[in-house]
């Protein structure tokens, strides 16, 4: 699969969200961080903004719910127009049931793991998902430095995906930039959330293209992709 670049609107100008969404319409998805000031120490946006964004852009929305009680709230984001909804393993009461509900409503189901959360306990759950998100920073704020210590976790996750023959996307989020994306791709990631690396650039659309080119080149050389 070609690398997917998902610009994060957490790094966009919130007063110009519709314009900021249009500025990256060559992107694969638009990553929307939803924070409730409980699961993470920050407050961002909710269902009404997702509804507005869905009307304002043709780019599908990839909603990352950094919230408590995602079992209750996640289905509302599908109804609001999200094409993919990510809940946190650490917050979900019944992750399999929730993933199935998200899928039944017509969106891709994704689960996120904080840096300290290992992937191995969730191995049997992976077939229920369309994507797994490995956080490469502590969730809650944009602009943080990439955690290199997450690279072995990305590799282990890719190995599990191959072991079970899954068509599971592997997303990374946090500190992804021109300086780090190749390492992520080499480790096994194929979906990349980029915030300030895109919206901090003078030409966000060109930044998306450049990141995708970098990731594709690294993937082509990666050992995990050789038998694809």
Curated annotation (Swiss-Prot):
Pathway: Carbohydrate degradation. A divalent metal cation binds at residues 31, 33, 64, 173. Transmembrane segments: none annotated. It comes from Streptomyces coelicolor (strain ATCC BAA-471 / A3(2) / M145). It catalyses: D-ribulose 5-phosphate = D-xylulose 5-phosphate. One of its GO terms (molecular function) is D-ribulose-phosphate 3-epimerase activity. This is Ribulose-phosphate 3-epimerase. Keywords: Carbohydrate metabolism, Isomerase, Metal-binding. InterPro entries: Aldolase_TIM, Ribul_P_3_epim, Ribul_P_3_epim-like, RibuloseP-bd_barrel.
């Amino acid at each position: 699969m070609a690398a997917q670049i998902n610009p994060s609107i957490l790094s966009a100008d919130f007063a110009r969200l519709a314009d900021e969404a249009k500025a990256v319409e060559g992107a694969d998805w638009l990553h929307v961080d939803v924070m409730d000031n409980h699961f993470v120490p920050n407050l961002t946006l909710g269902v009404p903004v997702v509804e507005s964004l869905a009307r304002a852009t043709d780019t599908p929305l990839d909603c990352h719910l950094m919230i408590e009680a995602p079992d209750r709230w996640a289905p509302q984001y599908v109804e609001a127009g999200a094409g993919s909804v990510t809940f946190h393993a650490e917050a979900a009461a019944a992750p399999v049931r929730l993933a199935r509900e998200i899928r039944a409503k017509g969106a891709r189901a994704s689960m996120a793991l904080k840096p300290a959360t290992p992937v191995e306990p969730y191995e049997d759950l992976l077939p229920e998902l369309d994507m797994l998100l490995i956080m490469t920073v502590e969730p809650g704020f944009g602009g943080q430095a990439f955690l290199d210590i997450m690279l072995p976790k990305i590799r282990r996750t890719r190995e599990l995906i191959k072991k079970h023959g899954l068509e599971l996307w592997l997303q990374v989020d946090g500190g992804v930039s021109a300086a780090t994306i190749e390492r992520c791709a080499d480790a096994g990631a194929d979906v990349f959330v980029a915030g300030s690396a895109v919206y901090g650039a003078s030409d966000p659309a060109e930044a998306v293209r450049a990141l995708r080119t970098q990731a594709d080149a690294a993937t082509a050389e990666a050992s995990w992709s050789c038998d694809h």
